[in-house]
């Protein structure tokens, strides 16, 4: 078996994981809107579909355990590793990502 790390397959799994994860969150958002508008049956369909997307995303992530967290590159799999990866991801968000986005957005806000 060839190494998954730095392969086209790893790249594809990361892209598929991101797509399935985003679909899950969109469908949950759509379900919430359907609930607010009184479409309870539609909301239930969105939630069921979101759960399916979760299963797909988890399947991709299971393969990616071999190469690490797709967001941080940290090892994942055990609870200890998962906690470290989650902390690394959240730390990146508040120390780098959002600060960078603020600096990029500032000129737009001023125009």
Could you describe each region identified by the protein language model?
Residues 40-72:
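Conserved alpha-helical segments that form or flank metal/cofactor-binding pockets of metalloenzymes
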Residues 102-111:
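Single conserved hydrophobic/aromatic residue that forms the stacking wall/gate
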